[in-house]
């Protein structure tokens, strides 16, 4: 299903072998294809809200008495790790890291001119 959708979006150098993005010899996505996928994803209002959230707190549960804070580590939208990389037009993004790929980043910005 993911491979069919990627092809529908115009991706030509992508093959998903799992749904979690973790390393697999047959799991590949080019930067161009990731841009195509991301351009489609940002059109979804829930996705846009999630990737643009700076901080979220999971309420207490029967397993955890205190709230659990989740901080966005994307330095262009969140000052969690300092303010030097904040970008006023950034509306969201997704950071990532695996031992095979190293650091990864997709970022969305809008500037009305």
Q: Where are these predicted regions, by residue range?
A:
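Penicillin-recognizing serine hydrolase domain
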Residues: 1-113
């Amino acid at each position: 299903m993911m491979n069919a959708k990627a092809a529908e979006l115009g991706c030509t150098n992508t093959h998903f072998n799992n749904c979690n993005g973790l390393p697999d010899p047959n799991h590949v996505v080019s930067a161009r294809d990731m841009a195509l996928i991301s351009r489609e994803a940002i059109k979804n209002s829930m996705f846009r809200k999630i990737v643009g959230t700076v901080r979220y707190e999971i309420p207490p549960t029967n397993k955890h008495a205190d709230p659990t804070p989740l901080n966005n580590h994307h330095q262009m939208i969140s000052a969690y790790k300092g303010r030097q990389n904040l970008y006023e037009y950034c509306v969201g993004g997704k950071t990532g890291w695996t031992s095979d790929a190293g650091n990864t980043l997709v970022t969305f910005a809008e500037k009305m001119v």
